[in-house]
Each structure stands twice: as structure tokens, then as C-alpha cells.
């Protein structure tokens, strides 16, 4: 508990991306800010700035690649970032206040759940089918990525979704999207490699 540590003079650094409430509208700038903070705390400001520069270059390279391929498309592909329950059950979608939002935007994809005024929310099969994303990115915390990808077919009505019909499904470890950390840049590159070639 933070107050107990503070009362005995032990400093505590809380990672806002992992706290309840977290960062309201996360983005790549939050990743860079956290690296700067850790650089200060551990007296490694130069290394932090070097890492930030590398991450900024990688994001800029992806955005340039996406801008180049966007001119070849009539309209951007739509996408949903989901956290399904393997074996059936609740499916969650990532909305406007998640790291998935800036990640999809940088990847040149339009989040079909951008109107969700939450980080993550439970969605019904009907709602998912009605939004008909071109691309599905399914996140998982553990287990077999193929099983997670296959779990999409357990959701009633998904056989009519464009992403399923066109086999545009990517299973990714959750930490490649959530929370806002340097791994979100790895996830961005993976999404673009999969869907924007």
C-alpha cells in the first residue's frame, strides 16, 4: 500500500498504465513520457532519450508506410480489437480510451468500436456482427494463440463477418496493445505487417 511505504520513507513509483483508471486517453506520447520518467528515476536520461528516439522513428516509419499504402485503397479497412473468452463466454472490445485506438489509427485502420467511450467493454455477438469489421485483432494473456484465433468461430454470427470470411484475424499477446508500453510499438508493426502490405 502506497501510504504504508510513504510513512516509512520508501518512495513508490506507480505505473499509471497499470492502475485502475489508468491513463484516460493513452497514446504513444505516454509511452515516451514513461520512459523519460524511468530515465530520471534510474539516472539514465540519455539511454531513455535514445530509446524514445528509436521508438519515435519506428512509429514514423510505420505511419509513412501506411500513408503510402493508403493511396492504393478506396477506403481504410475497419478493425475491432477483441479479448474473447476461449471456450465461449464474454467477448470484450477495446474502445476510444484504450491503447488500441491510437495503435489502429497509426496502422491506418478504422476502429469499429471507436464510439465506445470506455477503455474496454463487453460486446454482444449481434453488436460485433452489426459492425462487420474487415480485420479482427484478438488479444490473449496466455495459452495457444491459434486457440484464441479459433475461438472467434465460437461466437454466434461471426461466420458472416468480413474479417472471418476473408481470414483477416490476428492473435496477439495482450501486452502488444495494452497498456501503453514500448511493446505497443511492436504490436503496431505486427498489425501493419499483417494487414497493410
Task: Please tell me what each predicted stretch does.
Residues 2-41, 161-162, 170-171:
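Flexible loop/hinge segments that line or gate small-molecule binding clefts
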Residues 25-34, 131, 135-197:
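Structured C-terminal subdomain patch of bacterial secreted/periplasmic proteins
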Residues 107-117:
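A local structural motif
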Residues 47-107:
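Basic- and aromatic-lined ligand-binding clefts that recognize polyanionic substrates
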Residues 17-20, 117-118, 141-143:
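Short, acidic/turn-prone active-site loops that include or flank metal/cofactor-
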Residues 1, 10, 125-138:
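Proline-aspartate-enriched helix->loop->beta-strand connector
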Residues 20-25, 36-50, 87-93, 174-181:
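Second-shell loop/turn segments in exported
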Residues 116-125:
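Short helix-initiation/N-cap motifs at beta->coil->alpha
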Amino acid at each position: 500500500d502506497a501510504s504504508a511505504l510513504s510513512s516509512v520513507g520508501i518512495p513508490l513509483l506507480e505505473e499509471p498504465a497499470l492502475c485502475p483508471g489508468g491513463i484516460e486517453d493513452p497514446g504513444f506520447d505516454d509511452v515516451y513520457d514513461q520512459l523519460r520518467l524511468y530515465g530520471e528515476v534510474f539516472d539514465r536520461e540519455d539511454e531513455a532519450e535514445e530509446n524514445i528516439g528509436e521508438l519515435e522513428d519506428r512509429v514514423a516509419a510505420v505511419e509513412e508506410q501506411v500513408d503510402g499504402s493508403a493511396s492504393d485503397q478506396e477506403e481504410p479497412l475497419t478493425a475491432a480489437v477483441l479479448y474473447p473468452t476461449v471456450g465461449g463466454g464474454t467477448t470484450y472490445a477495446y474502445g476510444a480510451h484504450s491503447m488500441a485506438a491510437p495503435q489502429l489509427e497509426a496502422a491506418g485502420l478504422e476502429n469499429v468500436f471507436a464510439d465506445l467511450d470506455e477503455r474496454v467493454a463487453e460486446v454482444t455477438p449481434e453488436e460485433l456482427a452489426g459492425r462487420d469489421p474487415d480485420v479482427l485483432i484478438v488479444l490473449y494473456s496466455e495459452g495457444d494463440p491459434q486457440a484464441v484465433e479459433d475461438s472467434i468461430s465460437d461466437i454466434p454470427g461471426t461466420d458472416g463477418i468480413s474479417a472471418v470470411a476473408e481470414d483477416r484475424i490476428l492473435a496477439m499477446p495482450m501486452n502488444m496493445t495494452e497498456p501503453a508500453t514500448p511493446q505497443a510499438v511492436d504490436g503496431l508493426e505486427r498489425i501493419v505487417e499483417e494487414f497493410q502490405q
